[in-house]
Amino acid sequence: MAATFFGEVVKAPCRAGTEDEEEEDEGRRETPEDREVRQQLARKREVRLLRRQTKTSLEVSLLEKYPCSKFIIAIGNNAVAFLSSFVMNSGVWEEVGCAKLWNEWCRTTDTIHLSSTEAFCVFYHLKSNPSVFLCQCSCYVAEDQQYQWLEKVFGSCPRKNMQITILTCRHVTDYKTSESTGSLPSPFLKALKTQNFKDPACCPLLEQPNIVHDLPAAVLSYCQVWKIPAILYLCYTDVMKLDLITVEAFKPLLSTRSLKGLVKNIPQSTEILKKLMTTNEIQSNIYT
């Protein structure tokens, strides 16, 4: 095989190597038992949306069933804690579904009776304005499950007249900069938005060559493809567990159009957040 550009290293074909590979391929041929195991695992890893009240699956995607104008998605413990304290306590929210999934990092099997310490992915809408949706997702959605999650939530042909806001965290060591990460004022916010998102961001935009990962990246890419206005707020922090300072780093979002009308009493919400942190510390303490 010829090189396609100067300096490219190419391997010459080797008959012996080809024969070895053919023997390995024969040894790797799938048996009926292997196929059955693979199919069982695939079924186990299917993402399902359920109504916990009725214990039934949603037959259509969430946003096909319910009209949506605004959708706020919190991914990870600190983002979830921010929405719980500042948004969910400022209005009456009704649960409309929850995601049931199983993978290497998320093994919650009983979605009907979730404890406060379990990983979860729950969807709500605002009773006074049912087109406003909120998702609290503290569980890990594996790479092979992300497309399923998007289909179950948005559907195969999503509406474009809605606005998506995503909140999540990454460790500060993932942030690429010419400076030392030790000198950065952690935690700090960066934003990344789709081409159709026209509102100003409440923090600086994420610079190249930084990238986003996992479910937040999948949601943002989906919105870019479908021309849905969406913005991701990414908090870089040196504390990935539930942390008061990291949660409060999301406070600039309270002035954005997405959240401005949803938060009524910031001092009261701050007190609720502190109580939430205290409860979490007590539950995490092995000596209590």
From Swiss-Prot:
Residues that bear Phosphothreonine: 18, 54
Domain of life according to the entry: Eukaryota
Predominant place of localization: cytoplasm
Modified residues (Phosphoserine): 180
An example Gene Ontology CC term for this record: cytosol
Pfam families for this protein: PAC1 (PF16094)
Residues where N6-acetyllysine is found: 264
Keyword terms of this UniProt record: Acetylation, Chaperone, Cytoplasm, Endoplasmic reticulum, Phosphoprotein
GO biological process: one example: proteasome core complex assembly
Basic and acidic residues composition-biased segments: 26-37
Post-translational modification remark: Degraded by the proteasome upon completion of 20S proteasome maturation.
Record-listed N-acetylalanine modification sites: 2
GO MF terms held by the record: molecular adaptor activity; proteasome binding
Keyword 4Fe-4S: no
The keyword Chaperone is assigned to this record: yes
Localization per Swiss-Prot or TrEMBL: Cytoplasm; Endoplasmic reticulum
InterPro entries cross-referenced by the UniProt entry: Proteasome_assmbl_chp_1
Chain positions covered by the region annotation Disordered: 1-37
Function description: Chaperone protein which promotes assembly of the 20S proteasome as part of a heterodimer with PSMG2. The PSMG1-PSMG2 heterodimer binds to the PSMA5 and PSMA7 proteasome subunits, promotes assembly of the proteasome alpha subunits into the heteroheptameric alpha ring and prevents alpha ring dimerization.
Family the UniProt entry places it in: Belongs to the PSMG1 family.
Quaternary organization: Forms a heterodimer with PSMG2. The PSMG1-PSMG2 heterodimer interacts directly with the PSMA5 and PSMA7 proteasome alpha subunits.
Protein's name in the database: Proteasome assembly chaperone 1
Provenance organism: Callithrix jacchus (White-tufted-ear marmoset)
